[in-house]
Amino acid sequence: LSTKESPENEKDDSRKGIKALTKNSQATTRNTATTEASKELKDQTNKVASQKEYKNHDPIILVHGFNGYASGTGPITGKGNYWGGDRLKIIQDYRAKGYNVMEASVSAFGSNYDRAVELYYYIKGGRVDYGAAHAAKYGHERYGKTYAGAYKDWKPGQKIHLIGHSMGGQTIRYLEELLRHGSPEEVEYQKQHGGDISPLYKGGQDNMISSITTIATPHNGTHAADLLGNEEIIRQVAYDYARSKGNKLSHVDVGLSQWGLKQREDETLAQYIQRVKQSKLWTTKDNGFYDLTTEGTDILNHKTSLNPNIVYKTYQGESTRPGPNGTQKADVNMNIGYTLTANTIGKVKDKAWRENDGLVSVISGQYPLNQAHTSATDQVQKGVWQVTPVKHNWDHGDFVGTDTSEVRISKEELEDFWDNMFEDMVRNEKVTDKQ
């Protein structure tokens, strides 16, 4: 009896995968924090106190993934949080342990470029400037929201640690590249058209990041995004969110206001929905859906490079088991929301990509395939991806505590994982702060 999937079954799996991904917000987990949305900009957390009060000299900033939300901006309030779920409160817990740690707020569905720019302004403060050339190229507004600034003194010599979960790791890599090398497109556009240009696009800003740590990041893309498709999933998810959550009374910020997905004060709901239908968002590749594909990520990998002054480290899990003919199947203890995508990834043509955490293949989460890597040891190394051992039985959400049904990974194990990572940051500073 052949176990080869029929085209009809493959299509059915893809349709089910689309439904599951939409329902479960999957290219990373959904945040549902309780902080009032009105506090997001004013109480953007995170005033940096005197370093002598903390274990870490350089502030630690956590960057959420696709369809992730910072405190108070998510679609469902009162039922957990992105960083720790119901198991930990990573921001509060680690501040109590003596660490200077913050959570960034960037677009839930935006492209890595847009999210990287937002992350820059989240840290530095000011009104988001996506760049005149970028805005003209893709057809969205040049300016976005205004951030209060979590670390206004951030500049060369004043470093930070960046930790990204899922797509957050890609976003961090893009920001680092912009800091060092800027945007030649923006520089050229300004030369031709005049006007102002953000310091971010001029480049030359090194010695600002101490370490980059990625957790379950699809450095080489995810077949889940490939199979779902860019346009269909955007229409299904973003339009529904925009229609239901982008109205004037909603606290939800999906991070697509630059595309017009926010109702204006003088606009009726009917007028808003009609305007949304005309947005160029529906046909663009300037969004997170495309950037998570293997094609979109390949572009990112060839745009970015390793900084010899930064400590890089990756963490990746797996929660699949061998199936027929070399396939991989979701483990019985995997979060049920990931099982369809896990099984779909587990059948892709290239066997090296089949083992996965429900959303990201192990081979994708370890390091960008075109960049230098080595096995992580106790020695602090810079300018190379230090790959930690694969964490077996850990699915995509286990790292951030959002799998409420998890029985094999205890709260203590999760806390140990984060304890070790934060202690690692402090050890890194003994090397990186000498620069």
Model-derived regions, located:
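Helical cap/lid subdomain of alpha/beta-hydrolase-fold lipid enzymes
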Residues: E177, H181-Q435
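Short amphipathic alpha-helical segments that mediate assembly, nucleic-acid/protein binding
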Residues: K11-R15, T34, S38-L41, V252, ...
